Regions:
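Non-catalytic cap/lid and distal C-terminal segments of serine-dependent acyl enzymes
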Residues: 1-237
Length: 237
């Protein structure tokens, strides 16, 4: 059985409330494998994350019950772009909010020994996850990046890091260079940028499972790939 608790967090930095969920098994453990999920509502509704979690509990109960998901959602499409894209009005503030307000307080509330700490995101949610990790690289053990909508500037952020020890699961579709943003009408060249990001992460010392699949930039792809990403988080060390 799963426990899903819906909560609200008020940010003094952004002066607004954010809804988030805590998802765990009903068997509490002393240790936690903590996974922070951006686009949390989409992962629940479109990615069917709860089904994937339940499958993991049935297959590997001893380790899967250590999983704790923190699923935060940025709001509507424009809120998301402003928070997750480096050109967004709230991008820098959102990074500060996550690293200085949200993450510390939420993790104290969990009350467990955190032995793994990861970030999961799709598209722009993967981009903000990468940037959150870049704020304090030593804090994170795992990054799960599904079709990360990164720009040259985000790759430059990684280039500025001295060295990382991240374990990275990175997937992208072979047809994603064709994707055009519905908000900005610009081509994001997602496949090309992911190849560049992969090279930079390797250069910086990350250990990576990288794959290009016969897919487009859509939730059907990320949903089908989600179990692989979660198993990487659980079993790769």
């Amino acid at each position: 059985m799963l426990n899903r608790t819906k909560k609200t967090f008020h940010s003094n930095i952004l002066k607004q409330d954010y809804e988030y969920c805590v998802l765990t098994s009903d068997e509490e453990t002393e240790e936690a494998y903590l996974l922070h999920v951006q686009d949390g509502k989409d992962y629940l509704e479109l990615g069917e994350l709860e089904n994937a979690f339940q499958n993991l509990l049935e297959k590997q109960p001893e380790i899967a019950r250590k999983l704790v998901f923190i699923l935060v959602h940025p709001g509507n499409s424009m809120d998301r772009w402003n928070a997750y894209h480096h050109k967004g009005k709230k991008f820098k503030q959102y990074l500060t909010f996550m690293t200085e307000e949200f993450l510390p307080e939420v993790e104290v509330e969990i009350g467990r020994k955190i032995v793994r700490r990861g970030l999961l995101g799709d598209s722009l949610a993967a981009n903000i996850s990468l940037n959150i990790a870049g704020m304090s690289p030593e804090t994170w053990t795992h990054l799960l990046l599904q079709s990360a909508a990164v720009s040259e500037k985000d790759i430059e952020m990684v280039e500025q890091l001295k060295h990382v020890q991240w374990l990275v699961y990175q997937t992208v579709g072979k047809y994603e260079d064709e994707y055009v943003s519905l908000l900005t009408n610009e081509n994001l060249y997602i496949l090309t940028r992911n190849r560049e990001l992969h090279e930079m992460l390797v250069k910086k010392g990350a250990r990576i499972v990288y794959s290009e699949q016969e897919e487009k930039h859509e939730w059907r792809f990320w949903k089908s790939d989600l179990m692989n990403a979660l198993e990487f988080f659980l079993f790769t060390s």
